[in-house]
């Protein structure tokens, strides 16, 4: 059976943008009767939400799309927001180094991207790469949704 996708709107105050904002994410229908969806992309600026989280959403007739109600089941994934500080830095090398650590990336532009760190990935390796790049003032990063498992990884 082919997966069914729906748009899910999320409203929140973004610390990155410093304003109230709305972000549209894609969700795979998990249970249509219960309005449960699995988030299928990485939130760019958003709240404590990660790719693959199962969320409950209600359909908004006026907007003609679903609105997030709450997170039903966290995926255990971590979302990391990254700002590139160095203008003349090889972006491909940067992305490949992070991707090599078993992550996924979604780009906003040349200066901002988000990382999905799957639950099975050892975050200690990812964190070491990010911390080294931050120390070199290549990037600055934030962890708006650090899973308990990944928090424990960096404390090993």
Model region roles, listed by residue range:
Residues 31-41:
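Short, structured beta-strand/loop micro-motifs enriched in basic residues and often containing a Trp
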Residues 1-19:
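Extended boundary segments
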Residues 60-72:
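Short, Lys/Arg- and Gly-enriched loop/turn segments at beta-strand edges
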């Amino acid at each position: 059976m082919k997966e069914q996708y729906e748009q899910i709107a999320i409203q929140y105050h973004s610390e990155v943008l410093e304003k109230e904002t709305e972000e549209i994410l894609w969700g795979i229908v998990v249970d249509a009767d219960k309005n449960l969806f699995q988030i299928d992309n990485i939130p760019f600026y958003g709240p404590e939400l990660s790719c693959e989280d199962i969320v409950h959403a209600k359909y908004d007739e006026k907007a003609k799309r679903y609105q997030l109600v709450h997170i039903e089941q966290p995926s255990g994934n971590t979302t990391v927001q990254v700002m590139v500080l160095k203008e003349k830095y090889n972006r491909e090398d940067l992305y490949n180094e992070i991707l090599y650590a078993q992550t996924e990336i979604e780009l906003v532009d040349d200066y901002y991207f988000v990382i999905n760190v799957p639950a099975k990935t050892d975050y200690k390796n990812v964190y070491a790469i990010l911390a080294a790049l931050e120390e070199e003032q290549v990037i600055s990063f934030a962890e708006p949704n650090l899973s308990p498992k990944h928090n424990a990884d960096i404390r090993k």
